[in-house]
Amino acid sequence: QGFYSQAEMREFIAYAAEEVGLDGSDDIAADYSAAGVDVIAVLQQDMTGYNGSVEDLALISDYTHPDLTAFLGELLDTYQPDLLWTTTTCGYACSDHAPWTSRGYRAAFSFESRFGDYNPEIHSIDDTVATLGGSAAHAAKFARLAVAFLVETTLDGSGLFSDGFETG
């Protein structure tokens, strides 16, 4: 017995042109919406390498779907119980989750820190791996969250996802 139906598809999408107005994600979300593509959930991960807060990561709570954000919290509590996490707000449509949310898709966004504590070298000449302490350890926490998200959203009624999230 497999974890997923072949009728369902999982996609990993990398966007271009975020910094000039979310153009890449907006184009893809618009195309999916126009084609009536049934998307059960979108997980956005942006800026995952810098640990600027006491907490290990933050879940963005504005311009996101509240139930999906709560689901990410459940995943963190279940699969990374020693991890400290919090919620935070951007105050605007700050990343590629926003075009999905604005079209009625459920999107959630995990971020490297509280919003005001992100990498101070962002978009500068000093925005290098050295700023991250030469390690991807912080980003690995997000990779584990993404794997938990992928697995739990493919389970058929036997995981956290069986609590009714998939039906709204």
Question: What does each model-found stretch correspond to?
Answer:
Residues F12-Y15, W100, F165:
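Aromatic-residue hotspot detector
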Residues M9, A107, S162:
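A residue-level signal for beta-strand positions that form part of recognition/binding surfaces
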Residues Q1-D67, F71:
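Acidic/histidine-rich catalytic neighborhood of metal-dependent amide-processing enzymes
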Residues M47, E112, T167:
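Active-site donor-binding loop signature of nucleotide-sugar glycosyltransferases
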Residues S53-G157:
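Active-site-adjacent substrate-binding region
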Residues D27, E121, G164:
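Conserved beta-strand positions that form and line the central face of beta-propeller blades
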Residues S158-G168:
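Extracellular carbohydrate-recognition regions
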